[in-house]
Amino acid sequence: MSNVLTGTYAIDPAHSNVEFAVKHMMITTVKGRFGDVKGTITIPEKGEPTADVTIATASIDTRTEARDTHLRSADFFDVEKFPQIRFVSTKADRTDDGWKLLGNLTIKETTRPVTLTVTEEGAGVDPWGNQKVAFSAIGKFNRTDFGLTWNAALEAGGVLVGEEVKLSIDAQLVKQAAAQDKVAA
């Protein structure tokens, strides 16, 4: 994207969303989000962009407190013992409108490769003079690969919670000062 400037950008949590969707009872989809997301994306003059993102597991929100409490428990994320999810990119392949971003996703100390399809949404300067870039991304993974194995069998067959997790990310990032770019490199 010709509008995207090189440098290191930090996620703007007020203008970014990390959402997920999982089948419930094999017939409906439950959606949720994580409210506490931090990280950086570095866009070099040449070569591949890199990403390093952390998500606070306790910030999970499905709009149902009882379900959120269960998701924070040892049955799922065990937020007391494993307070963060982390994604670190390992490779980026250019596509027509963005990137295939390959990386390592770590949940509960289990790391597995995940691929995100990233679309460049635009770049600009906000009213306060901050350089911004925006990306959207989608991906999926099997939750049981990360030790998120709790489930309950249904009388008619099947299970309560689906294994496939679909991710949807909308991120706005703000360019960091040049001195910070050098420190991050």
Question: Which role does the model predict for each range below?
Answer:
Residues M1-A185:
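Low-complexity, acidic/polar, glycine-enriched regions of mature
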